[in-house]
Amino acid sequence: MDPLAKAEIGATGLNVTRLGLGGAPFGGLSEDVAQQRATESIAAGVDVGIRYFDTAPLYGSGKSERYFASALKGVERDSYVLSTKVGRLLNPTADAQTDDVYLNLPPMDVVFDFSRDGIMRSIEDSLKRLELDRIDIVFVHDPDDHHDQVVKEAFPALAELR
């Protein structure tokens, strides 16, 4: 199997490379990653032909999304597919944040929010951090303990945005 061959995701019309690049490590998952190292890694992925990138607000409280914004500047927007996630809102705070999973976090309170307004705000905030005018795929992040609200509010909100 060629990891750089493209495959369509269902009947969406979106074609992604079989190998994608996930952004959790760039948010400081288990190890702090400097922006230069993250952007160089993403650029190396682009250089070898990777055209599917996944990130989330949760990954480093927005750091991963900002690093993708920096690394993908100048890359033809229609040449890649980018996914992010909803379900967490990032609210600035004066206090430094600590986390058992992500290191060196910016001062943000991370709040679960699967409401319609929360979904819309999450997408708008991600677009700003990513410096993009569109997100190709939006996943609901960790819906397990919020099943009813996800079904009643998050999914209908995402369906509106199709």
Predicted regions and their residues:
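Short acidic, glycine/serine/threonine-rich loops at helix termini
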Residues: A94-A96
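Glycine/proline-rich, positively charged
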Residues: S30, T98-R162
